[in-house]
Amino acid sequence: YDPISGDYSIRLDANESFLELPIELLEKAQYAMADIAFNRYPDPNATELCESFGAYYGIDPALVTAGNGSDEWLFIITSSFLMRGDKILTVEPDFSMYRFYGFLAEAESVVYQKKEDLTIDVDALIAAVNESGAKVVLFSNPCNPTSLGLCREEVRKLITSVSALVVLDEAYMDFWDQSLLGEVAQYDNLIILRTCSKAFGMAAVRLGFAVANPKLTQTLRAVKSPYNVNSVSQKIGALVMNEQEVLHQALDEIILSRKALQISLKELESKYPDQLYVYDSCTNFVLVRMPRAKEVFEGLLERGIAVRFMGDTLRITAGSAEENAQLLKNLESLLSSSTNP
């Protein structure tokens, strides 16, 4: 995974929230810093933070363990539950870091290839898991980068049909309604990952959570570093998650932005049917297939707009109304220039 570097006026490449935290909330965070004993190590259990997470989602905080973004959990889980030569099954396309962490654990990679329309045949996936003898299954739902998701019933079927540990990355589930967080305690082979980087607008803070039944949670807490989440991140994360009304309003605004962006991109698809295909989305971004994806990507960069280039597709984060308008204006300019040389 190679993040885009450089100074671009419009950043629609990393699926961050386009909304900054309200100034009132930032002022509360500033005052909260006075409560931190900077000469002391942080709470090893991130108790206040996990309680705020539990209150926000309506789950038992005893099932929640905090980490430095989901990336820390991906490393911890793959290095703790896999031994050299064990098999990890991932799906393609999906978040590229999953296979990378499996590689670091010296696990054997097994790949389930999605259908041509980028959806998952859950029965075929179950067969692939069981036939391969995979010890860990790791995938995102909804999926990054496809913007598509598996419904709750299909994920349940997967979990109950395999003996492998299912690691379900729900980084984008705040934008959909098919989470299994409320059921996680029922399963002895499920770990759900959540993040503060997307819907909550706290990408800079780097907070991620692993949610699992009591036995798995005990294991996760045993293998993580004792003081892994610093006191500043704990304090800010708890403070923000306690502001449920603010977060819900922001979430509504992000979803409206994505829907508007998707509608506008679909209009461009109707106008230039040979140049782009727009996928459905249950996330905060839209995936667009384009035969000239690289050329368009570079053209947008030249105009100060960063999106994510992924082979024959572009992944476009929903931005503010102004950012979306600039993207669409420049995108149409690039599309029309090829049809009218």
Short names for language-model regions:
Residues 153, 294, 299-308, 312-341:
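PLP-dependent enzyme catalytic core of the Aspartate aminotransferase-like
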Residues 116-174:
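Active-site phosphate-binding strand-loop segment of PLP-dependent enzymes
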Residues 22, 189-268, 278:
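PLP-dependent aminotransferase class I/II
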Residues 255, 268-303, 318:
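Conserved PLP-binding catalytic core of the aspartate aminotransferase-like
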Residues 60-64, 85-87, 170, 188-189:
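Short acidic capping loops at alpha-helix termini that bridge into adjacent secondary structure
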Residues 80-139:
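PLP-dependent aminotransferase-like
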Residues 46-50, 61-85, 208:
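Conserved beta-loop-alpha segment that forms the PLP phosphate-binding cup at the N-terminus of a helix
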Residues 1-40, 132-133:
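N-terminal "arm"/small-domain region of PLP-dependent enzymes with the aminotransferase-like
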